[in-house]
Regions:
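Structural/interface elements that position substrates and couple domains in central-metabolism enzymes
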Residues: 1-360
Length: 360
């Protein structure tokens, strides 16, 4: 198939490269000309194991099936599907800022000649597809093409930084949200993901669009909840003399619980969990459903991030004339992403405390 991926960040570049590895013809689109030029020259803007090799092989000096362009107009008439993989940062009130997603939708509406699928790959709140469809329809109306047929779908990503390539090529599940009547869009997704479903058709989960949008937020919020829960258990274990690693092993052998996401630490960070928990809390608030559990999860995580500083102060008796090494600043192994990383909170707090203690 021929597809376009708008946005070349973690999600967009990994998605585009892996689709190309599967044999699809892929155009990766980004308005950042410097980034596109670097990609054409084999310079990958992010670190992700296995990604550089795939990009270089599929791009093949411009002769492969992976292409890099600056505007959707350079490929819109060659593709049947356009994926929006641009950022959805948290707004001041915690909601997801959709300006980049809607900008892509606007450009799609300005260019499409119809019978194409617009896919939101970015993590977006429930109701985004309706907004996207409205923007596209408005642009088509301006062009006098208000009868043009197109489809809007949701295909959330489930990629973990540090193992994103593996996650894409060996997915636990593939979630696609399409309207019941959009049989053509559904058929295109079935064709696109066929290599993953040959032996396991149930791996492709097709839902209505709002459910697909909610699945991603609910999944990430559930994982964040497990992290905060185990951090609270670890803190209590420390007070009562229990060993949290032994507790974790005892819990994880219960098939209903499992071993994953039971490791205590200094809180979750990165580009997804903090943003998605905030967005789901805001969605609940806007719809009269206060998300009390997630509000507590967020508060526990905030406190957990500063716990290393308190522990260190206690062990060292203060920071006066102490040299402290922070080993690793990314929010997790096998990535260079420091967004919302606990290390940044501790470094800032340490510098402030060092000044108060009289050290330089």
């Amino acid at each position: 198939m021929k597809i376009a991926i708008v946005g070349t960040g973690y999600v967009g570049l990994v998605t585009g490269a892996c689709f190309a590895k599967m044999g699809h013809n892929v155009w990766c689109v980004d308005i950042d000309k410097e980034k596109i030029n670097k990609l054409k020259n084999g310079l990958i803007p992010i670190y992700e194991p296995g990604l550089e090799e795939i990009v270089k092989k599929c791009y093949n000096g411009g002769n492969g099936n992976l292409h890099f362009v600056n505007d959707l107009s350079e490929c819109i008439h060659d593709v049947s599907m356009v994926f929006s993989a641009v950022g959805t940062p948290s707004d001041v009130d915690g909601s997801a800022d959709l300006k980049y997603v809607l900008a892509v939708a606007k450009r799609f509406g300005e260019l499409t000649e119809g019978r194409q699928v617009f896919v939101t790959k970015s993590t977006v709140p429930v109701g985004t597809a309706k907004k996207v469809s409205g923007v596209i329809a408005e642009e088509l109306l301006k062009r006098g093409k208000d009868g043009t047929e197109y489809w809007v779908a949701s295909n959330p990503e489930f990629l973990k930084e540090g193992s994103a390539v593996s996650d894409f090529l060996k997915p636990d599940r593939i979630v696609v949200g399409v309207n019941t009547e959009d049989e053509i869009a559904r058929a295109q997704f079935e064709s696109l993901y066929y290599p993953f479903t040959i032996d396991n058709p149930g791996k492709l989960i097709i839902t209505d669009v709002p459910s697909a949008e909610m699945i991603k937020y609910a999944s990430n919020s559930m994982l964040a909840t497990r992290i905060s829960f185990m951090n609270e258990i670890a803190n209590l274990c420390e007070k009562v003399g229990a060993n949290v690693d032994q507790v974790r092993r005892g819990m994880g052998t219960d098939a209903r619980i499992g071993n994953k996401f039971l490791y205590a630490g200094c809180g979750y960070g990165g580009s997804c969990f903090p943003k998605d928990v905030k967005a789901l809390i805001k969605t609940g608030h806007d719809n009269g459903e206060p998300m009390r559990l997630l509000t507590a999860v967020e508060e526990v995580n905030k406190n957990q991030k500063i716990k290393p500083l308190a522990t260190l102060r206690k062990e060292l008796g203060g920071f006066d004339k102490k040299n402290i090494l922070v080993w690793g600043t990314a929010f997790k192994p096998e990535t260079d992403d420091i967004r919302e990383a606990p290390s940044l909170v501790n470094i800032g707090s340490f510098l402030k405390s060092s000044s108060e203690d009289g050290s330089s």
